[in-house]
Amino acid sequence: MALTILKAENHRRMPWKNGGGVTVEIAVHPQGASVDDFDWRVSMATVASDGPFSVFPGIDRTLSVLEGDGILLDVEGEETKLTRESAPLAFAADARSSARLIGSAITDLNVMTRRGRLAHNVRRLPVDGTTLTVADGNPALLFCSEGQLDLNSGSEAVRLEKLDCAVFAGGNAEPLTIRGKGTAFLISIVAI
């Protein structure tokens, strides 16, 4: 398994596509792709005010709240409350969508894939001193949103600090053992 660690201090900052804020790009494929030509992309953003989401034609998106009180997300007139405890929410990134803050600003995690080429799945994994074992044959990313996590793939052992991300480029055919105290998001990318 090919394992790459993306350290938080190296994540790339750039303006939102709609100019309304700043996004922190964690990972993108192909490497160096722009917001218009990526196959998949994982990023974070701080939402400090109510407003529309950027439109990404032909893209599917999953949104998770990492910090803050949450948002009321309106996608094509259907409103969903998203908080740190909510399951990640999948929706079309080309759908008309906007957010209203429930309280203070939030930080969110965005996972996006090009529809018709790839699909993705996002799972929140709380780790509280226990050991979790994840086995999945698809390319995957493990994003540490809180705490410190020790990963062991059988052939490699690494530590993720808050906001670090591990990329398993060749898929995770070996079981991945996660130890520590914190929260991770397991992101699987699947070719269609």
Give residue ranges: language-model regions:
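Jelly-roll (double-stranded beta-helix
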Residues: 1-192
